[in-house]
Amino acid sequence: MTCPNNQAGNSFFVDSLINVRPDSGSYYQSNGVYLPPGSEFSYGLSGGSCFPGIGKRNEPSAQSVISSPAPYVQGMETWLEASRPCRVDQPRGQHMAQCSFSPNIKEESTYCLYESDKCPKGATVDDISYSASSCPVTSTFPVPGYFRLSQTYASSRHYHDAHPNTDHFTLQQSARPDSRSSHRQAASAEPEQRANREESPVCAPCVPVREEDSRLSSEGSSSPEPAETPSLECPEKSGKGDGKNETAANWLTAKSGRKKRCPYTKHQTLELEKEFLFNMYLTRERRLEISRSVHLTDRQVKIWFQNRRMKLKKMTRENRIRELSNSFSFS
């Protein structure tokens, strides 16, 4: 701890405190302060000094706070307030040294390397806090520490040049509006092409049943869910009547509003449902006959009946639980 305010008072105060003997008390006539020996009090003088933070000048300063004086040392307190030989408190004007870290970051975001009319990209790259007034009008450049690659990557070779070539920038400015206009024309042409495609829709030919069967057999074997819902047909088949279109929409829409998986057509599902009403379990011969009649493979018919039996079991379980919950009130 250094005492910069009063050097004469500092030397007298420190030397007088260092010369105090720990075994006997000391008395200062000028101030009327009596310092008892260290043996009487445990919190008294340690090592012959009044404060633990004050030592010899050659020793390193100890980082400790000055404790408040005892009630019998009131004269010492007034003596410290009068001359102020060693004070830890700083004047109110110097609260805290201003940190230079955050202003540097702020200046970095607001620096403009070139003039505003020569660097049109600076406005898009800069932060929201960027203002036109912060951009210098002169051709002088700031310290290289504020050099930003994002602003001057394309024209970095003009950084060391005192007079950059203005023709390069004017050519770039004249070329940019042309490119923007071409982009706008291309963007306006895309909706027209989409509208033309919507006006003349081409109906994709229906996939042959055999190819669809080979594709759906793998799906049916991997999914245990019931798959009796029909798939979308061609517009020629589905466009026979408005009532049939509404029923097809009901078939294709699940309770949650999503589209169902439709590996089977409506005709195939109806035939399989009729057979399931007569017999839940099929023999191999009957399964082969049904597969030929509905144009499905033997494996697809087998998987459909398995899924339909699981669905029936689930529905009966839910109905039983609903009946029990209605008969017994759990309130």
Curated annotation (Swiss-Prot):
Residues 167-176 have a biased composition (Polar residues). Residues 257-316 bind DNA. CDD domains: homeodomain (cd00086). InterPro entries: HD, HD_metazoa, Homeobox_CS, Homeodomain-like_sf, HXA10/ABDB-like. GO terms for molecular function: DNA-binding transcription factor activity, RNA polymerase II-specific; RNA polymerase II cis-regulatory region sequence-specific DNA binding. Keywords: Developmental protein, DNA-binding, Homeobox, Nucleus, Transcription, Transcription regulation. Its main location: nucleus. This is Homeobox protein Hox-A10b. Belongs to the Abd-B homeobox family. The gene is hoxa10b. Residues 158-251 are annotated as: Disordered. It holds the Pfam family Homeodomain. It is found in: Nucleus. It comes from Takifugu rubripes (Japanese pufferfish). GO terms for cellular component: nucleus. Sequence-specific transcription factor which is part of a developmental regulatory system that provides cells with specific positional identities on the anterior-posterior axis. Residues 217-233 have a biased composition (Low complexity).
